[in-house]
Amino acid sequence: MYSVSAQKYTDIYINDANKVGLSWLNDINHNQYENAYNLLAKEVKEKYPHEAWITLINELMLEFGNLESRTVTQRNFQSQVEGMEDGFYVFIEYSSQYENTKEHIEYLLLKQNDKAKWEIFDYNYEFKNKKEE
């Protein structure tokens, strides 16, 4: 019984985190950088001042071009992540199609804050440039 209940909560955490992740990605894809910045974890905000982060993410989105599609390829809940405090973490991997890239994969790490809200803790990606064909 415990494992069924635990799995149910894990699924809820993953689904809730994925909604926040997709909303955040939608914000950065549609120049809603202020909204996106507000969803960053405090640790990220401490590393990247507001204006610097907005400049960086804007340049990145210009490089990628317009989003054509995005599909979740992996989702994983963990309560422990090496080098980080214990908590609730969700890793999500997306296969994305952008105008200027190919074989584009986006990775999000979300962390639940002390108010039980999911926040973006890390964003990473890999791709090949379409011009390299």
Positions of predicted regions on the chain:
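Short solvent-exposed beta->alpha transition segments
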Residues: 18-19, 34-87
